[in-house]
Swiss-Prot record:
<feature type="region of interest" description="Linker">
    <location>
        <begin position="227"/>
        <end position="247"/>
    </location>
</feature>
<dbReference type="GO" id="GO:0005737">
    <property type="term" value="C:cytoplasm"/>
</dbReference>
<keyword id="KW-0548">Nucleotidyltransferase</keyword>
<dbReference type="Pfam" id="PF14602">
    <property type="entry name" value="Hexapep_2"/>
</dbReference>
<dbReference type="GO" id="GO:0009252">
    <property type="term" value="P:peptidoglycan biosynthetic process"/>
</dbReference>
<dbReference type="GO" id="GO:0016020">
    <property type="term" value="C:membrane"/>
</dbReference>
<feature type="binding site">
    <location>
        <position position="73"/>
    </location>
    <ligand>
        <name>UDP-N-acetyl-alpha-D-glucosamine</name>
    </ligand>
</feature>
<feature type="binding site">
    <location>
        <begin position="383"/>
        <end position="384"/>
    </location>
    <ligand>
        <name>acetyl-CoA</name>
    </ligand>
</feature>
<feature type="binding site">
    <location>
        <position position="363"/>
    </location>
    <ligand>
        <name>UDP-N-acetyl-alpha-D-glucosamine</name>
    </ligand>
</feature>
<dbReference type="GO" id="GO:0009245">
    <property type="term" value="P:lipid A biosynthetic process"/>
</dbReference>
<feature type="binding site">
    <location>
        <position position="136"/>
    </location>
    <ligand>
        <name>UDP-N-acetyl-alpha-D-glucosamine</name>
    </ligand>
</feature>
<feature type="binding site">
    <location>
        <position position="330"/>
    </location>
    <ligand>
        <name>UDP-N-acetyl-alpha-D-glucosamine</name>
    </ligand>
</feature>
<dbReference type="InterPro" id="IPR011004">
    <property type="entry name" value="Trimer_LpxA-like_sf"/>
</dbReference>
<comment type="pathway">
    <text>Nucleotide-sugar biosynthesis; UDP-N-acetyl-alpha-D-glucosamine biosynthesis; UDP-N-acetyl-alpha-D-glucosamine from N-acetyl-alpha-D-glucosamine 1-phosphate: step 1/1.</text>
</comment>
<feature type="binding site">
    <location>
        <position position="377"/>
    </location>
    <ligand>
        <name>acetyl-CoA</name>
    </ligand>
</feature>
<feature type="binding site">
    <location>
        <position position="102"/>
    </location>
    <ligand>
        <name>Mg(2+)</name>
    </ligand>
</feature>
<protein>
    <recommendedName>
        <fullName>Bifunctional protein GlmU</fullName>
        <ecNumber>2.7.7.23</ecNumber>
        <ecNumber>2.3.1.157</ecNumber>
    </recommendedName>
</protein>
Amino acid sequence: MSLHIIILAAGQGTRMKSELPKVMHCVAGKPLVQHVIDTARRLEPENITVVYGHKGDVVQAGVSGPGLLWAHQAEQLGTGHAVAQGLQNLSDDGQALILYGDVPLTSAATLKNFLAVSQGKLGVLTVTLDNPTGYGRIVRNDAGSVISIVEQKDATEAQKAINEINTGIMAVPVSRLKEWLPKLSNSNAQGEYYLTDIVALAVESGVDIVTAQPSFLHEVEGVNNRIQLAALERAYQQQVAEELMLAGATLRDPARVDVRGVLNVGRDVEIDVNAVFEGDVTLGDRVKIGPNCVIRNAVIANDVTIEASSIIEDARIDAFATVGPFARLRPGAHLFEKAKVGNFVEIKKADIGPGSKVNHLSYVGDATVGSNVNIGAGTITCNYDGANKFKTLIEDDVFVGSNTALVAPVTLGKGATIGAGSTVTKDVSDKQLAVARAQQRNIDGWTRPVKK
């Protein structure tokens, strides 16, 4: 039986008090609805239809991935009405899985189990709460079979005492869905077409109704306000932190590490507090990440140390290199084995060769630095003339003195030495000493100006 997934993402989310559609608010740096789409793809459905409404152009522009189908819900008339908008993409012999764009953390494992028990039946994902107030109740008969779902505003006092609630996630044979949706009525307290009313129609039709529950409560928790958004962020980060620790990483405080993408760790990795990882990041064995670091789309090899408050983006760092504290590696930076980038150093689109050092207060951009090079404090590669970028080539075993400006394009040959305070505008050959600075003058009898 083919699988069709419908994701409901049309709501405005007025309680968010935001110009942004609710489903475009983020957990772990990713829009809520993108989490749902990514999970849906792991189920390998025939198609995924996203039902959009409020600011649909923002939703369509803000999610990624090929092959999404879109259905417009011009008026928000309830969940049953929303699902009906996506029916044109569903084949009658398939099964429809209904998901919600503001319920981001449902796992693929939970959904696979749910689909397995729902084949050919009406499946309802439920959960049991100590305080079910506000949710639709699962009403069962004396035999324990589900006979209806009653929304909070329509429930009797006896029904309000039921603590098994509907999560909203359903699996339905498409042919039955097309049969039941036109029969829905909006004669209820909300004046809406409830998708949950198909349960009573299933009972009338003699269709079996089955239920399943998720492994964790946060898998079915939705977002209606920013407090709930923050709670799901913490739940997600706690889950990721536990996975990292089980994979061999030590987190100094699991509550103070944020992963906003995919983080792969080797053995005996150490991550200090307030580290943020974004995009795709790989940490090799025995990598040490200091406090307050931001690492985005980086590959960091074994035995690398990243000191406190360093920022690394789209960079590669080879084994035994060290970075920071307070260093910045921008896109295109590559530190080779045992290279060192120290405090208040910025590297952009540059290779720093094996064993080379840029220890303090320097900028190296659009450059290739060979092996065993020492770049003194305050060195700048002047790579931009206001219109174009130019490259600096520093070959092996070069020594660059402090407070030096290297005006690109320029090449420093192997073993060259640059005197401190130089502004180098011409190539320096192998093993040459270059000194390019004004001659010092000492003036006797100098009197400092005084304030008038």
